[in-house]
């Protein structure tokens, strides 16, 4: 059984595991890892098939969560960005005793638009899947450009994301496709009503992938959770607003 790439740093008395989004890798956290490792024992992870975690094909969400858990500390705050938010949520559902708090960043329990549920139109996700087989580097770059659109620092934020992608070999097409399949099909809205650990949801007001309309809907569906919207951020608030982002996690640490 393959292991995934995993790096731990810092000496904090609380463990914090960071899970990246689709098409990316753990290098995306370099803008905040120094600050966070001064407060936490920080764990940077390349999800199976992404970055340095080679030798995996496309996995289901449940399998991806199990692979990640194998190398994880007994107890930690789990933070997942975008697709990583689904992985962290899945772990909170299946192994709640291992999760001190759940943090989702620019993530939705159901990324795909459904009846009376705002999200990414299924044909857009299907289009990305189709384009992957034609020109997958360009498709990934288009997806990244969507993530920073509208912010004051959109250009440099997009450059930071692109640099992260290009720093390591591109994931295999079937892995990227499998990730899009998860974004297209998974719906955790009902299951997450039952989690009891502290649950913090962070959003960008300008996010083009996770519409802000979902925030009040989830506030109502999950009254035990807390939400916060970064007013001038899009899909990557930790890149556009690193200091504010880290502050929120340090405050959360006091509660676990």
Curated annotation (Swiss-Prot):
Keywords: Biotin biosynthesis, Cytoplasm, Hydrolase, Serine esterase
Pfam families xrefs: Abhydrolase_1 (PF00561)
Catalytic reactions on record: 6-carboxyhexanoyl-[ACP] methyl ester + H2O = 6-carboxyhexanoyl-[ACP] + methanol + H(+)
Active-site annotation: 82 (nucleophile), 207, 235
Keyword Hydrolase: yes
Entry's Gene Ontology BP terms: biotin biosynthetic process
UniProt EC number: 3.1.1.85
Intracellular or extracellular location(s): Cytoplasm
One annotated Gene Ontology cellular component of this protein: cytoplasm
Function in brief: The physiological role of BioH is to remove the methyl group introduced by BioC when the pimeloyl moiety is complete. It allows to synthesize pimeloyl-ACP via the fatty acid synthetic pathway through the hydrolysis of the ester bonds of pimeloyl-ACP esters.
Family membership: Belongs to the AB hydrolase superfamily. Carboxylesterase BioH family.
Protein name: Pimeloyl-[acyl-carrier protein] methyl ester esterase
Protein species of origin: Escherichia coli O127:H6 (strain E2348/69 / EPEC)
